[in-house]
């Protein structure tokens, strides 16, 4: 795999640009109108003049790394993590680590932050594309709430309550004498289904004919609005991606 620096070299060479990485920038003072100062070199320092300076802040995970811009009176948004997984300490769902649901919907309760995609249950909580997308959409909100919020999961993607109720009712009518444990929506792994029906108080030996309206309501609600308490975050791979700057 080619690094970003390697990819930039041919372009810099063609444009006769100089790559000084990893030399730090000490300051970017704004010059008064007039002729540009010539480039100069002093001990341990290079001075450059330019009509335009483009600053890309992705490499500064801390606000202190942007201190060289303070003299320009720019609004600097504090960098915060924006691509991470969710910690759900103490939840029995973590016992399903390695379980994947290919199309789930996840949202932050009480907000409009929502994402869809594959969800992975881990030994610390939840991960996968849907969680990473949600963490990026809600990065500032999560930071403001110290990564302590309620996560709502719809295990059947964007399916509405009406659609899920129809599906579960059909399963019940078509399989009255079969065990609920052994008959479930094809999208849901068997281990997850067993966990969900146990969570709503359905016994492993219960049959569909025994479910009843209250059991149906609890099951449907859990399938479309399964809530977990997020308590912290974990790195995605080796680094936190940040937003802000």
Language model region names:
Residues 75-78, 88-211:
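An anion/pyrophosphate-binding glycine-rich loop and adjacent beta-alpha core
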Residues 62-80:
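Glycine-rich beta-alpha-beta "Rossmann" dinucleotide-binding loop(s) and their flanking helix/strand
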Residues 52-62, 81-84, 111, 126-127:
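Short acidic/polar capping segments at secondary-structure boundaries
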Residues 47-60, 69-70, 119-124:
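Short hydrophobic core segments
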Residues 55-56, 76-79, 232-233:
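General beta-strand structural signal in soluble alpha/beta enzymes
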Residues 195-245:
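A glycine-rich dinucleotide-binding beta-alpha-beta segment and adjacent secondary-structure elements
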Residues 1, 56-64, 87, 91, ...:
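Short beta-strand to alpha-helix junction loop
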Residues 1-49:
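Intrinsic disorder/low-complexity segments
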């Amino acid at each position: 795999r080619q690094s970003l620096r390697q990819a930039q070299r041919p372009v810099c060479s063609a444009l006769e640009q100089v790559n000084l990485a990893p030399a730090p920038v000490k300051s970017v003072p704004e010059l008064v109108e007039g002729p540009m100062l010539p480039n100069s070199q002093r001990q341990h320092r290079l001075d450059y003049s330019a009509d335009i300076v483009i600053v890309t802040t992705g490499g500064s995970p801390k606000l202190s790394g942007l201190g060289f811009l303070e003299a320009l009176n720019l609004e600097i948004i504090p960098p915060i993590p924006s691509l991470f997984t969710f910690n759900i300490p103490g939840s029995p769902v973590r016992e399903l680590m390695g379980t994947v649901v290919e199309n789930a919907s996840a949202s932050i309760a009480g907000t409009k932050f929502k994402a869809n995609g594959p969800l992975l249950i881990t030994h610390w909580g939840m991960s996968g594309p849907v969680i990473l997308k949600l963490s990026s959409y809600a990065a500032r909100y999560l930071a403001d709430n110290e990564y302590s919020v309620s996560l709502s999961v719809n295990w059947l993607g964007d399916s509405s309550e009406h659609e899920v109720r129809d599906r579960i009712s059909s399963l019940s009518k078509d399989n009255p004498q079969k065990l609920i444990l052994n008959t479930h929506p094809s999208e849901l792994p068997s281990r997850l289904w067993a966990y969900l029906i146990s969570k709503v108080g359905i016994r492993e030996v219960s049959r569909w004919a025994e479910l009843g309206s209250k059991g149906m309501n609890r099951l449907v609600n859990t399938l479309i609005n399964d809530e977990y308490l997020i308590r912290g975050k974990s790195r995605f791979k080796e680094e936190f991606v940040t937003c802000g700057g």
